[in-house]
């Protein structure tokens, strides 16, 4: 192994590494109750899908064409929101993601900000779909 590879494994927390390697939440949830999508000026796009039952996020997933840090942050958001109420999920902040990961480089904090912005869009969409359920079936992607 070269030094950069060794440094990557040694320089990151277990939570960061788990979110970097875990793939079960990286998927499109068909018929999601809430959906958010945001592209940054650099071209990275993050999508978040929420399944909501009885006011709680039963399942969350994401898709991105972004870098490793975009994956890690979106995966963290999907992980942290499951089981929370929509209001409880709104309490998450970029700092919540950064604190959970422990070793997200400061220059990549915009990835945490983007993931939280997309979560808020997905929550707003879920609330809109609660008020007007027929909108849930409109094409979103």
What are these regions (language model features)?
Residues 54-63:
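Short, well-ordered strand-loop elements centered on a beta-strand within folded domains, enriched
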Residues 71-76, 114-117:
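Short amphipathic alpha-helical face segments that pack within enzyme cores
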Residues 64-72:
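Short, thiol/selenol-centered motifs that function as redox-active sites or metal-ligating centers
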Residues 1-35, 58, 84-141:
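C-terminal binding/interaction regions
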Residues 29, 39-43:
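A short catalytic or substrate-binding loop motif that flags glycine-/basic-rich loops and adjacent residues
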Residues 44-54:
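Short beta-strand elements
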């Amino acid at each position: 192994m070269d030094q950069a590879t060794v440094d990557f494994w040694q320089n990151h927390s277990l939570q960061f590494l788990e979110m970097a390697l875990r793939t079960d939440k990286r998927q499109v949830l068909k018929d999601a109750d809430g959906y958010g999508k945001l592209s940054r000026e650099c071209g990275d796009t993050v999508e978040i899908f929420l399944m909501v039952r009885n006011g709680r996020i039963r399942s969350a997933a994401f898709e991105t064409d972004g870098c490793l840090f975009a994956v890690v942050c979106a995966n963290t958001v999907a992980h942290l929101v499951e089981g929370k109420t929509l209001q409880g999920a709104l309490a998450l902040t970029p700092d919540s993601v950064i604190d959970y990961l422990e070793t997200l480089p400061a220059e990549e904090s915009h990835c945490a900000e983007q993931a939280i912005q997309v979560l808020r869009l997905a929550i707003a969409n879920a609330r809109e779909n609660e008020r007007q359920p027929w909108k849930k079936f409109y094409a979103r992607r």
